[in-house]
Amino acid sequence: MLLGVNIDHIAVLREARKVNDPDLLEAAFLSANLADQITIHVREDRRHANEKDLENILKYCKCVVNLECSIDMIEYALKYKPSRVTLVPEKRQELTTEGGLNLNNDKLQEVILKLKQEQIEVSLFIDPNLEDIEKSSLLKADFIELHTGLYANIYNALYTNINQTSYALPELILSKNELKKLLENELQRLRQSASLAKSLNLNVAAGHGLNYKNVKNIVDILEIKELNIGQSIVARSVFVGLEKAILEMRALIKR
């Protein structure tokens, strides 16, 4: 199974103090030697990574780069030409991407065409539902990336102590039996979505909220060929170093 390391959270540490440390390019070099691709999200407000980071990584780091960006940031994708662009929704007030892309956006078809004309692979970050899979195929995307955020949130509510903390999600303060049912339902949505996507000749990736404990259920969905993981790897690296954190995740997703 392929691993994309999202290095945005290295930039989060850098921006916490507004200095040039830790060096995002150093993290990219290390990740490129251990993972199959680097994923970087350049947001409209540049709160974490910025276009200079993207430019440097593409210039000096000879690996596959997956740029996450909103439709409104597409000019930078066309300028710098990463290997792949994953189109994601974006809200200025969100801490992290909260849901899948709205595929009913009138601009989407034109944006996809422009990217493909520049030989850039196109991935759509979508919620796991069959309607969006079919639309992604009609839009002629190369990849879909299934949003695993709801799965990860339910897993955390069921198997960690998060519901006893200030980070609890009110809608997931439920009994264990209720959470188990929700978890299985979400896994079934992911399985069905991945199966349909593969049957429509879409490459299938997944990501958001995946960590060292919850990733196994996603690895077991054989139609998913790639995972993009960031926050949990960077969090683990605080204790064991980035190299070991990536290698530990690689071991968990090996088939």
Curated annotation (Swiss-Prot):
Q: What is its main location?
A: cytoplasm
The reactions it catalyses are:
3-amino-2-oxopropyl phosphate + 1-deoxy-D-xylulose 5-phosphate = pyridoxine 5'-phosphate + phosphate + 2 H2O + H(+)
Q: Name one Pfam family in it.
A: PdxJ
Which InterPro entries has this protein been placed in?
Aldolase_TIM (IPR013785), PyrdxlP_synth_PdxJ (IPR004569), Pyridoxine-5'_phos_synth (IPR036130)
Any one cellular-component term (Gene Ontology): cytosol
Question: Which CDD domains is this protein grouped with?
Answer: PNPsynthase (cd00003)
Q: Name one GO biological process term.
A: pyridoxine biosynthetic process
**SUPFAM superfamilies cross-referenced by the UniProt entry:** Pyridoxine 5'-phosphate synthase
The active site consists of H41 (proton acceptor), E68 (proton acceptor), H208 (proton donor)
Q: Which residues bind 3-amino-2-oxopropyl phosphate?
A: N6, R17, G209, G230, Q231
Keyword annotations from UniProtKB, A to Z: Cytoplasm, Pyridoxine biosynthesis, Transferase
Q: Where in the cell is it found?
A: Cytoplasm
Chain positions recorded as 1-deoxy-D-xylulose 5-phosphate binding sites:
D8, H9, R43, H48, T96
Sites marked Transition state stabilizer: E145
In short, the EC number is 2.6.99.2
The UniProt GO MF terms for this protein read: pyridoxine 5'-phosphate synthase activity
Q: In which pathway does it act?
A: Cofactor biosynthesis; pyridoxine 5'-phosphate biosynthesis; pyridoxine 5'-phosphate from D-erythrose 4-phosphate: step 5/5
Q: PANTHER family per the record?
A: PYRIDOXINE 5'-PHOSPHATE SYNTHASE
HAMAP family from the UniProt entry: PdxJ
- Which family does the record assign? Belongs to the PNP synthase family.
Record text on subunit structure and interactions: Homooctamer; tetramer of dimers.
According to its UniProt entry, the function of this protein is described as: Catalyzes the complicated ring closure reaction between the two acyclic compounds 1-deoxy-D-xylulose-5-phosphate (DXP) and 3-amino-2-oxopropyl phosphate (1-amino-acetone-3-phosphate or AAP) to form pyridoxine 5'-phosphate (PNP) and inorganic phosphate.
Report what the protein is called. Answer: Pyridoxine 5'-phosphate synthase
**Name of the gene:** pdxJ
